[in-house]
Regions:
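Sequence signature of WD/YWTD-type beta-propeller architectures
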Residues: 15-394
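Bacterial N-terminal signal peptides
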Residues: 1-10
Length: 394
């Protein structure tokens, strides 16, 4: 079973902090690299995948735990479900909203829709929002419309949304997306926002942000796949992502860091909703910028102020390290970490923008990224190494 461990940092300059297990119930507690802390820092939200079977499709509940007491609370569970290799609905990948006591997460097809929609799958899921007070009060964020004989309902999507991430001001929600009507198109990204013209049954109007081309058909510079996305800044005016793009030789591919500019006043209703033969396209005024031509990977992370983006890349010594680049692309990327064993995962900014956190060699580390003499200085906040107990906490 997966348990949650909280790290208490007594002093950022100390070589180690205190780890404390906070969950003990006999089920999995999965964070999924999302925005799991409540706005007041009291709770962590999680799903329970892998308890009854593999994957989100077998997760039966969305829950939270109070960090100080370890008390767990159920936030949402489907009324009925089926588990196994063909499962539904499946709920998971939960994130808190920074501006209210709500969480958003993936919700697969309700059982009464399985005959029409099929079982849980990547292109067969919606976003749901639940009030995190234990009342179970919930709304559907988006509407799914897969009718192939007409254009898609404006503001709806035709597949599955995933990894729902609120902006820090709570106004927009970003997501990754898989299309069911045109499966020859790879994963891409989009966003949604509350709108009076949201389709019936949903609170938000949906649009894609990156118009990918069908797999294995890209011309040099065209994007076939977009993922690893996160907001840059508080207001959702930029969304950074990793794009798989055809190289200039017309044969090979590159994975590079991109940014989508989403103006504050963009009219989301100018987006094309798509049809059985055309993928949806972004609203007017959205612009895509390529920031790197060297390899980039992972889930990228932007500062709250929106001035810098952190991502993973391969250093000169062949290890995976954290690099930083200005969000406007005005300066070249800078290598921020120099871990002998490279970086594993868990990349996050401190709210100040002066420190990055990540996992290396099964330990949690903090790296100073404030410009100046201390840039790149790193301290491990936990023990590290290859011992069984470290693997258990990784």
């Amino acid at each position: 079973m997966t348990t949650l461990v909280v790290l208490t940092v007594v002093c950022a300059a100390s070589p180690a902090a205190t780890e404390r297990q906070i969950t003990f119930t006999p089920k999995n507690h999965h964070l999924d690299n999302n925005d799991n802390f409540s706005p007041d820092g009291r709770f962590l939200c999680y799903d329970t995948r892998e308890t009854l079977g593999p994957g989100i499709e077998n997760s039966q509940s969305i829950e939270k735990v109070e960090i100080v007491t370890g008390v767990e609370a159920l936030l949402y569970t489907p009324g009925s479900s089926v588990t196994g290799t063909e499962a539904a609905p499946g709920v998971g990948a939960v994130s808190y909203c920074a501006q209210g006591d709500t969480v958003a997460f993936i919700h697969g097809p309700p059982l009464d829709q399985v005959n029409d929609r099929g079982y849980y799958a990547k292109p067969n899921r919606n976003g749901m929002e639940v009030v995190a007070d234990g009342s179970g009060k919930h709304v559907w964020l988006d509407r799914r419309d897969t009718v192939a004989t007409r254009e898609t309902i404006p503001g709806a999507h035709r597949g599955g949304t995933h990894r729902h991430e609120y902006t820090l001001d709570g106004r927009r929600i970003g997501f990754t997306y898989d299309d069911v009507l045109l499966p020859q198109y790879g994963r891409t990204i989009g966003y949604m926002e509350p709108h009076p013209n949201a389709p019936e049954g949903a609170t938000h109007y949906v649009t894609l942000l990156v118009p990918v081309v069908p797999e294995r058909t890209a011309q040099p510079g065209e994007i076939e796949y977009a993922a690893g996305d996160s907001w840059v800044g508080r207001e959702g005016l930029m969304r950074a992502f990793i794009g798989k793009v055809r190289a200039e030789d017309g044969e090979s591919y590159e994975e590079s860091l991109f940014v989508v500019d989403v103006p504050r006043d963009v009219d989301i209703t100018t987006a094309y909703p798509g049809s059985a033969t055309r993928l949806p396209s972004p609203p007017e005024g959205v612009r895509i910028r390529r920031l790197t031509h060297a390899h980039a990977e992972g889930i990228v992370r932007g500062t709250p102020e929106g001035d810098r983006i952190a991502y993973y890349a391969i250093a000169a010594d062949g290890t995976r390290q954290v690099f930083i680049i200005a969000s406007d692309g005005a300066t070249p990327p800078i290598q921020a970490t120099h871990f002998p064993h490279g970086v594993d995962s868990g990349l996050r900014w401190h709210p100040s923008g002066n420190t990055l956190f990540c996992i290396s060699h099964n330990g949690v580390a903090a790296t100073c990224v404030k410009p100046g003499e201390r840039f790149g200085e790193t301290v491990f906040l936990t023990p590290q190494g290859d011992t069984p107990e470290r693997f258990a906490l990784a």
